[in-house]
Amino acid sequence: MPVLLYNQINPGTLQHLLERYGMVVKGVAANNPIPGSFWRPPEAGLAGNILFVRNDTPVHSALHEACHYICMDQHRRNKLDTDAGGDYEEENGVCYLQILLSDHIPEMGRQRMFRDMDEWGYSFRLGSSQAWFELDAEDVVAWLRRYRLIDDDNRPAWRLRQ
C-alpha cells in the first residue's frame, strides 16, 4: 500500500492543526524543489515556522518535520533552516508526537501512520512503529511530558518546547 500523500488529505486540516503551534503550511508547485527539505523532494521542508509541502509529499513526512519544530528548543527554532538536528531522545519524541497528531487528520489516523512509517523505513528495535509506540516508548513519553508537549493522558498539549 503506498503511503498517504498531501494531495490525499484536506490541506485545511493540516494547516489548522499546525496553526495551533504557530506554524504555516506552504504548498510548492509540482516538480519544483521543496525549500528546507533535508532529504530532498518529495520530503517536506522546514524553514523557521514554515512547513513546505508538495502534492506528492507524504503526510508522515509533513508531520515528522512539523514535530521537529515543536520538539526543538526556542534557540534552535530561531535559526531553523532545513536541518532540524536534534538528539536521539528528541528524534524519538518527534516520532511519537507525529503518531499522536496523525489522529487529528481524518484521512490518516494512527493505524495508517504506523503502516506508512513502517513502509517508508522508519526503524524501531521491536520491528514496527506500532510495537515501539505501544510497548517500548516509556522513555519517550517521559521526555515529552518533561517538556510539557503531551499531557498526563498522552494527548498533545498544543505548545512548543521552551
Where are these regions (language model features)?
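Active-site recognition of the HExxH zinc-binding catalytic motif
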Residues: 60-74
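Short helix/loop segments within enzyme catalytic domains
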Residues: 101-117
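Post-HEXXH active-site segment of zinc metalloproteases
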Residues: 36, 70-100, 114
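Secondary-structure capping and boundary motifs in well-ordered enzyme cores
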Residues: 51-59, 86, 90
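Pan-zinc metallopeptidase signature
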Residues: 123-162
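Short, mixed-charge aromatic SLiMs
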Residues: 87-89, 119-128
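Auxiliary, metal-adjacent structural segments of Zn-dependent hydrolase domains
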Residues: 1-45, 52-56, 100, 104-105
